[in-house]
Regions:
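P-loop NTPase switch/coupling surface
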Residues: 1-151
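Hydrophobic "anchor" residues on beta-strands that sit immediately upstream
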Residues: 3, 264-265
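Extended helical coiled-coil dimerization/tether regions that scaffold
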Residues: 136-260, 264
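Walker B catalytic acidic pair
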Residues: 268-270
């Protein structure tokens, strides 16, 4: 069905994500393999049909490209040998980032039907706060990823913005309207507002220190923490915020990264 197609697209781009260095790309699993009945028995014997083959066509680095991935046995690995253009593209991106080239990195992310509010906990590695641009690819093809990584990062952004403003006040500098963290916060808010505000009235998500959580504003209902909102609104905010967060991480040099970043976003059942 539709989910199988999206899962296949995620596997198709798995080697690209893997080759960027910090993230793991999607692979085939044994459960993806077709099973058929080969004979009539009381035990309902089923056999798996190998190889499982995925062929894809796409435009990689402005060139039309064909590639494929295969799984040949139950405990085998998903092949990568026929995905060299994607691997090379990912490696080239990694080199340019290290060389401080302001290359616009493409966004790719996948949000599956199983995405639930706070379902996926931050791993120890994520709690260490990856600062690399390439961290925008971490868990990007995990259909369960959504909100937790964004939450941790966004809290840091809001606190850093506040800290810089306090430092400026202590220096008797009254011009505290904007700093680099203000720009990032506003770009995230604009992205979420663009999708969520018109339909729900909720807008301007920000971390409030006194509440110790991220809150949203509404002209009718006032200010509530995201955890107090309905599941539907929370999940929509989480999805849009995660996309915007990845865009900002990948392309911090862009003035409005969520709007200017090209790429592919897979959403199963909006």
């Amino acid at each position: 069905g539709k989910t199988a197609i999206l899962d296949a697209i995620a596997v198709a781009f798995g080697t690209f994500v893997n080759s960027t260095g910090l993230a793991r790309g999607s692979v085939f699993h044994r459960s993806d393999v077709q099973r058929i009945k080969v004979r009539e028995t009381k035990t309902n014997e089923m056999e798996e049909v190998y190889p499982l083959v995925l062929e894809a066509n796409g435009v990689i680095n402005n060139e039309v490209t064909h590639w494929s991935r295969e799984l040949h046995k139950p405990k085998g690995a998903t092949t990568t040998k026929d995905t060299k253009p994607l691997i090379q593209y990912g490696q080239d991106i990694r080199k340019k980032v290290v060389q401080k080239v302001d290359e616009i990195l493409p966004l790719i992310s996948y949000y599956g039907t199983g995405r639930l509010w706070g379902l996926k906990k931050i791993t120890l590695n994520k709690k260490q706060h990856e600062t690399s641009r390439l961290s925008g690819y971490i868990d990007c093809l995990d259909p369960l990823s959504s909100y937790k990584s964004f939450e941790s990062w966004y809290v840091d952004i809001c606190l850093a913005e506040l800290e810089l403003k306090i430092e400026e006040i202590e220096k008797n500098n009254l011009d505290i309207s904007n700093n680099e963290f203000t720009v990032i916060r506003k770009s995230i808010q604009q992205a979420v507002n663009h999708i969520v505000e018109k339909n729900t009235g909720w807008k301007d998500i920000v971390y409030k220190k006194r509440a110790e959580t991220i809150v949203a504003q509404n002209e009718t209902f006032g200010e509530l923490s995201l955890m107090q909102l309905s599941d539907g609104i929370r999940n929509m905010i989480g999805l849009v915020a995660d996309i915007a967060y990845r865009a900002v991480k990948l392309n911090p040099h862009l003035e409005n990264a969520p709007k200017q970043t090209p790429g592919i976003v897979l959403i199963d059942e909006v």
